[in-house]
């Protein structure tokens, strides 16, 4: 193959690109030839929308304040804020691998969204770096690994407590100011390990070596992302996380009622006791089945069996009682049992709560949340599955399980970065797409349909002109989203 000559000015620093001609099937009498000499093109035109969301949230600016930069100020070419923007934009756009930035650093559109004034990189100090406006994979990697090390090559030090607090405060800022009831979903999941990472343990339930991260979501908004080793109880650290989360929520929304929702792995006396001691703080937590609980539910199970014999199908009967464990609970608590009998046989389930029977009311006596046992189980507790969908998006779309560094601290940093990128995409959907066809689209679908749009970038003294693909199917939606974000940023 013959190397294609780059004869336009924008190709001055593109001689390292792969420019060998690629031959495809003929199209009638014409040859079909392709190469990578297109110049200043980008496949991520939607990154401009992410830049607006970032500016509206002040996310990268706030996050950069959680790092201490020990580098010489006169030698810095990439500020911490620019490095974070580059990394977060890359994650949100689907470039979770740092090696992707080996070529992405020459993308002028990504450079513009990262805050680079010199989007072409022509003013770089070192001649061999000119044409690369953004940081290299090695520079980004040092920023992530500096969570573990402090030496000559790792001079950007994160303040880990501040990073976690910033994620929490950013998430709480995204909650509606007029909310009367907030539901906090806690859940743990597995993060498989394929090497000899620090904190590597085998987990019997998941049947593999893994980490056991703890997440907390309020609706679609992530509030907490904590990387933990798997040699612990699933609820370990939940009380400490809950105390921080409630404090930040109360500071912004002092009158809101909070419901903690979780599966049976979080039915721990310390968590429930603390909730019971706080004003307007409630819990709705699953209970694992045992012989005592099933014996208490047996009358309802018998009734359900009889009804199924008469009408077939699946029958549910709900029963409430007061229950206390033999050794681990300090007091008896309101317990709701679901006696379900279907084609597969008996399926008893249990939840424990301190939500009163009369429900939750505001100061005027208006009902905010029902207290009926059936409603609490079917309408409120079963919605807990949405948290699993959020974790799935965090894992599959933002690659939060890319915890492949050797050290636990740097893997925690990667988890946080994925959580911040998740927040960018979630806010793009909430602020820019509410009431549209993509208002409930998954983050992966949102990225594919709205952000992956071809763009040609022209740079002059006065402006950066981005020409988006004329055949883009969602042009009206893109423009509508941009207008909404611009209005929100200016308000």
Language model regions located:
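An anionic, glycine-rich sequence signature occurring as long contiguous blocks
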Residues: 2-9, 17-35, 282-396, 482-491
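Short amphipathic alpha-helical "interface-anchor" segments enriched in bulky aromatics
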Residues: 53, 367, 372-413, 417-429
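Acidic/histidine-rich, metal-coordinating catalytic segments
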Residues: 187, 256-267
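Short, glycine-/Ser/Thr-/acidic-enriched flexible segments
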Residues: 189-191, 221, 228-230, 288-290, ...
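Short, surface-exposed basic-aromatic patches at helix termini and helix-loop junctions that form
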Residues: 272-281
């Amino acid at each position: 193959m013959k190397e294609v000559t780059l004869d336009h000015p924008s190709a001055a620093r593109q001689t390292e690109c792969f420019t060998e001609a690629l031959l495809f099937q003929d199209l009638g009498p014409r040859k079909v030839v392709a190469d990578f000499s297109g110049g200043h093109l980008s496949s991520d035109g939607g990154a401009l929308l992410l830049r607006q969301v970032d500016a509206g949230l002040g996310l990268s600016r706030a996050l950069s304040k959680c790092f201490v930069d020990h580098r010489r100020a006169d030698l810095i070419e990439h500020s911490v804020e620019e490095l974070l923007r580059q990394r977060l934009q890359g994650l949100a756009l689907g470039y979770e691998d740092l090696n992707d930035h080996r070529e992405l650093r020459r993308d002028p559109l990504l450079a513009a969204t990262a805050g680079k004034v010199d989007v072409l990189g022509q003013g770089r100090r070192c001649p061999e770096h000119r044409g690369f406006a953004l940081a290299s994979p090695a520079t980004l990697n040092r920023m992530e690994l500096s969570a573990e090390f402090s030496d000559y090559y790792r001079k950007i030090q994160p303040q880990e407590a501040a990073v976690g607090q910033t994620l929490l405060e950013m998430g709480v800022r995204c909650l509606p100011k007029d909310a009367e009831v907030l539901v906090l979903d806690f859940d743990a999941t597995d993060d498989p390990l394929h090497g000899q990472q620090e904190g590597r343990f085998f987990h019997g339930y998941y049947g593999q070596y893994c980490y056991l991260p703890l997440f907390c979501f309020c609706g679609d908004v992530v509030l907490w992302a904590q990387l933990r080793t798997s040699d612990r109880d699933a609820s370990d650290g939940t009380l400490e996380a809950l105390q921080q989360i409630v404090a930040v929520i109360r500071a912004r929304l002092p009158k809101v009622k909070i419901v903690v929702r979780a599966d049976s792995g979080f039915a721990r006396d310390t968590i429930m006791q603390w909730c019971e001691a706080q004003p307007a703080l409630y819990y709705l937590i699953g209970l694992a089945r045992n012989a005592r609980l099933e014996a208490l539910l047996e009358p309802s199970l018998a009734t359900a069996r009889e009804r199924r014999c008469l009408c077939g199908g699946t029958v549910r009967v709900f029963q409430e009682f007061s229950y206390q464990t033999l050794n681990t609970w300090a007091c008896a608590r309101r317990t709701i049992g679901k006696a379900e009998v279907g084609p597969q046989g008996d399926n008893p389930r249990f939840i424990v709560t301190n939500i009163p029977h009369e429900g939750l009311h505001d100061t005027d006596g208006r009902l905010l949340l029902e207290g009926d046992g059936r409603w609490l189980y079917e309408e409120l507790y079963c919605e807990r599955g949405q948290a699993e969908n959020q974790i799935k998006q965090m894992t599959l779309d933002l690659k939060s399980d890319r915890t492949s560094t050797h050290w636990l601290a740097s893997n925690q940093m990667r988890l946080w970065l994925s959580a911040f990128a998740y927040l960018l995409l979630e806010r793009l959907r909430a602020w820019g797409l509410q009431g549209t066809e993509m208002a409930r689209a998954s983050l992966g679908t949102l990225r594919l349909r709205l952000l992956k749009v071809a763009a040609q970038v022209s740079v002059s003294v006065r402006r950066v002109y981005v020409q988006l693909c004329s055949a883009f199917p969602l042009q009206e939606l893109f423009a509508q989203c941009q207008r909404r974000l611009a209005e929100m940023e200016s308000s």
